[in-house]
Amino acid sequence: HQSTCGGMAYDTMNQILWVTGQGSTWAQANAITLSHLENYSFEDGYHPIEFDMSYNLYKIKRASFMTYHDGALFVGFFTQDNASVIEKYLINADGTLYEKEDMNLKRTVGVTDPVAYAVSMQVISGKVQGMAFYNNKILLTRSWGILPSEVQIFNYSRYGILSTSEAYKTIKFPERLEQIYQDGGSIYALFESGLMPTGCHPLTELTVL
């Protein structure tokens, strides 16, 4: 599992927590229901919680971060320098991901069953660690190592390019900013502090803006 701290999203309509993952070959989106989480106890057998749903994501190299917005799951792939993508997956009324047959996958790798289908894709710049929506705006966090972080703000467009040059506003942040989450009039910011280089200065709290 090589996701960042931004690799979780919560579906508020269906009360499902989504978690990024990596299978033996493909990126994955995995889901756990809120009721399952509330009834889980590690002390009951000392086993990790099992996913209620798991989907291979065939069109994205790795699922690094994700967010939920307006009945859809947005999944992005972190790269250090090269351009990358965010893909949009619709969520059905029962909380499952929208699936359909993909003739290209059937022809190239022999996948014949319906698969989680990305209905749109947007290009992003490198170093993107997290994503949020706020007042019809898209917010992307960018950070790498000890360099200052930033939040880039874009006007929301289904097919818009979300590269650095297209941002209409950029806000500087301290280093190691990863995921952000919008709730009401507040933005919650999560900073990396679990890796060896950052562990000597752990950050155990969320920052509310």
Per-segment meaning from a language model:
Residues 1-6, 35-70:
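Asp-box/WD-like beta-propeller blade repeats and closely related beta-sheet repeat scaffolds
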Residues 4-15, 58-75, 123-134, 178-189, ...:
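Structural signature of eukaryotic scaffold interfaces centered on beta-propeller domains
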Residues 17-23, 75-80, 140-146, 189-194:
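Conserved beta-strand positions in repeat-built beta-propeller and related beta-rich domains
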Residues 24-38, 81-98, 146-157, 195-209:
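Structural motif
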Residues 36-53, 93-116, 158-167, 208:
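Beta-strand initiation motifs
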Residues 57-112:
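Hydrophobic, aromatic-enriched interface-forming segments
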Residues 111-160:
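Loop/turn-rich, solvent-exposed surfaces of beta-rich toroidal or solenoidal domains
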Residues 113, 119-127, 160-184:
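Conserved blade-ending motifs and adjacent loop-strand segments that build the rim/top face
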